[in-house]
Amino acid sequence: MIIKRFIMKKIVLFLLVSFLLLSIISCTRIAVALTNKKDPFKEKTVWVKGDKEIVFIPMIHVAKAGYYEKVKDFLSQKRNEGYVVYYEDLKNGGTTPEERDTLTLKMRKIIGYHLCGAYTKEENKSTPQYLKKYVGQDMTNTGIDTLKDIRADMTVKELIAKIEAKREKKLELEPCDFETPLNAPYKCNNYKEYYYWFARRYRDDYLSNLLINTLDKKIVVIYGGDHKWRVYPSLMDGDFHLTEGKWYKKKEKSNNVTTN
């Protein structure tokens, strides 16, 4: 009995740790290992408030090519049905080359690696090796039309400004930051205590407010899967009701919906 209890405690602890790690950001090693599925619509949800409908597709940012082909076809179909596509795209936001470089270095100092550019390519040595065999999500493989679709995201400049306001002082760069090439492994001092705020919290609130207040009536959202943990409750607080898919934060019953 003692051994069984010990094993059960270990299993529960493992599951709790896995959940916490997954809740931080979609593109961690555990997220790829545990959530990389072939069907991008398995966790699709539909939210309705009056005559307004939001279709939310929780995305995996690193997957096999076929995954993104399905998303691309779905978005094309929905546009033909009159839906507006809202997509995730974290831009730099700097207005000069010098400012863009500084923002890029500050972002790396927060998240610990160079996010932009060769995300899963061999030349980017800062990207973990386990990501190399996958394809990174981009505008082309998901079929995003930047002229028609809506970029529903903040900029690195806006996020850095919020973090610096929160800590009441600037994020300081050091010689190590300038000496370490962007695509090299990052071993400088960091500000990882602001990782969650940068990757999730501020952007989740931005997306939630945009979806709740937009005048568009038929919307498809493609966004990193873990953003749902804050966006879905915000939609419910905004009186949206789940009409398709599953959500585990609130007991709510509606037609063809299972929640627990």
Outline where the language-model segments fall.
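Positively charged n-region of N-terminal signal peptides that target proteins for export
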Residues: 2-11
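Bacterial N-terminal signal peptides
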Residues: 15-23
